[in-house]
Design a protein with these regions (language model features):
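Conserved beta-strand-loop-alpha-helix junction that forms the acyl-donor binding cleft
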Residues: 18-28, 171-182, 196-200
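A short beta-loop-alpha structural element at the N-terminal edge
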Residues: 40, 59-74
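A short helix-loop-beta-strand connector motif used in the catalytic cores of GNAT acetyltransferases and
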Residues: 97-109, 136
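Conserved GNAT-fold acetyl-CoA-binding loop/helix
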Residues: 70, 74-97
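Conserved acetyl-CoA-binding loop of GNAT-fold acetyltransferases
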Residues: 32-41, 184-194
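Conserved acyl-CoA
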Residues: 3-16, 143, 154-170
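Conserved beta-strand in the GNAT
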Residues: 109, 115-124, 136, 141
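A conserved beta-turn-beta hairpin within the catalytic core of GNAT-like acetyltransferases
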Residues: 125-137, 147
């Protein structure tokens, strides 16, 4: 029945087959047997599965145009789920949207056709060391089904070019030791010591 439905959807032009499995292990195992893989979360934080598309399609990167875009909320929750954090609340989503409107943070979105499959962000702050604005690179996330297809490189390049065009003195990223090699390969190749934080 599932195969028949998927074949019908494909015949009628569906580009993606995605579902919310509710975190139920039995459902997850069933859909995995059909070919689906776990793929982030929806805008409410519920876990999703996606049938990876068979056809190749180009991935492009663009600046986020709509601070209230539901696809950004979806990517943010996928990012939070992957790093073991709770889904974003409606209040936090509105705070983020307002920060985007105010120009405090800029998002870049990787798209495969109309679907947003990845993101990253730059937050601006003033540095007394540089006596000008610097940028912090964050929210770097690509949906599992679309990794190893060049989206990471495209996002990093777009962010680095934007930081140059907007006269940011530097663009820095804080990461876990296991991710150092990845960020160095993406052009973040200057080591600036360690980061320590006071968390309220």
């Amino acid at each position: 029945c599932a195969r028949t439905l998927l074949d019908w959807a494909k015949e009628h032009g569906a580009r993606y087959a995605e579902l919310n499995y509710g975190g139920n292990d039995w459902r997850r195992h069933f859909w995995e047997s059909v070919g689906f893989i776990e793929n982030g979360a929806d805008e409410w934080g519920e876990p999703l599965m996606l049938l990876p598309p068979e056809e190749d399609a180009p991935i492009t990167v663009e600046l986020l145009a709509d601070p209230d875009d539901w696809q950004l909320k979806k990517l943010e929750n996928g990012f939070l789920k992957e790093i073991g954090e709770a889904p974003s609340t409606e209040e936090k989503q509105e705070q983020l949207a307002q920060a985007i409107r105010d120009g405090k943070i800029t998002f870049f979105v990787a798209k495969r056709g109309y679907r947003a499959v990845g993101m990253c962000s730059i937050s601006r702050c003033f540095s007394t060391f540089a006596c000008t604005d610097v940028g912090i690179f964050d929210d770097f996330y690509i949906e599992p089904a679309f990794r190893k297809k060049g989206a990471a490189w495209l996002l990093a390049q777009a962010a680095q070019e934007w930081s140059k065009e907007n006269a940011l003195a530097s663009l820095t990223v804080t990461c876990a030791p296991c991710d150092e090699g990845m960020y160095q390969a993406l052009g973040f190749d200057t080591h600036l010591g360690n980061t320590f934080a006071y968390l309220r």
